[in-house]
Amino acid sequence: MKKIVNRLIQCILTLFIVSVLCFALTKAAPGDPVLTYVEPNMSEEYIQNLRESLGLTKPLYEQYFLWLGRILHGNFGNSLMNNRPVLTQMLERLPATVILMGTSMLLGFLIAIVLGLYSGKNKNGILDKITSLFCYVGISIPTFWFGIMLIYLFSVHLHILPSIGMHSDGNRSFGDLVLHMVMPCAVLTFANASQYIRYLRSSTITEMSSDYVMVQKAYGMKESGILFHHVLKNAMLPMITVLGMSLQSLVSGAIITEQVFAWPGIGQLAVTAVMQYDYPLIMGITMFTALLVVLGNLLADILYAVFDPRIRKAGC
């Protein structure tokens, strides 16, 4: 319980620091959001009144605390592009991002279990070397380049997969959704699996050299039984933390991937907001994604404590 309380305090401090950095960097960015969205022939008086109505003439510290207070009440402000509530736009885009990120994380995790487990069991074998090459390539290749190559091969050259969007015009079927997901999901899955495999392989190698494995082998227990019933269970514990830590890279990868494939998620909305100097939307998306990442890490810590008795005892 004490450990959870400490983590909650850390989460609050993290979000506070993120809010300060987000506000400061946005204010320090070049360009005037007001001049971006007014007609060139508008009078200086009108522009000044607009700045006052948006609260941009107040001291920076006052602007920050007013903005923070609104966020704490669930009010992220209105977008400068369309004057719609920022929170409404994010919630509209959230399902598409969750579908893409959740599917890629699940597939990457399943691939990691198979390849990481057998790679760790057969250390320095042919499968281990092939898997290591797979991981190095997956970590090294930029997601945008991999996405563009997939579009060129499967959309431009072979014409077998759609390259943009979440659905075809007039087609909202599940099969159409799956076809649109194949390439963006493959990009994120490749990157995720490459990270997960390395950690699971390392944990498997450590567990395979443990005393309890030697004892079970001495008792004549089959190696496959030891691997799946004992080694996998213990090797999976560090993966809980890894999954929480990978949320940051998954979110950043999703932003790029959504833009490449025109996937209508929060990532694409974020890029549009940056290109249009829509500061309320930029700050809202930043805080919203930071909250999701922090909560994901907190959940990973809680699950780790639930499944590992040593952590529970240490936190008492």
Predicted feature residues:
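Cytoplasmic-entry segments and transmembrane alpha-helices of multi-pass inner-membrane transporters
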Residues: 1-9, 114-150, 237-239
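Alpha-helical transmembrane segments of integral membrane proteins
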Residues: 2, 90-127, 172-316
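Residue-level recognition of pore/gate-forming positions within transmembrane alpha-helices
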Residues: 11, 41, 109, 136, ...
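An internal, D/E-rich "acidic patch" concept
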Residues: 57-113
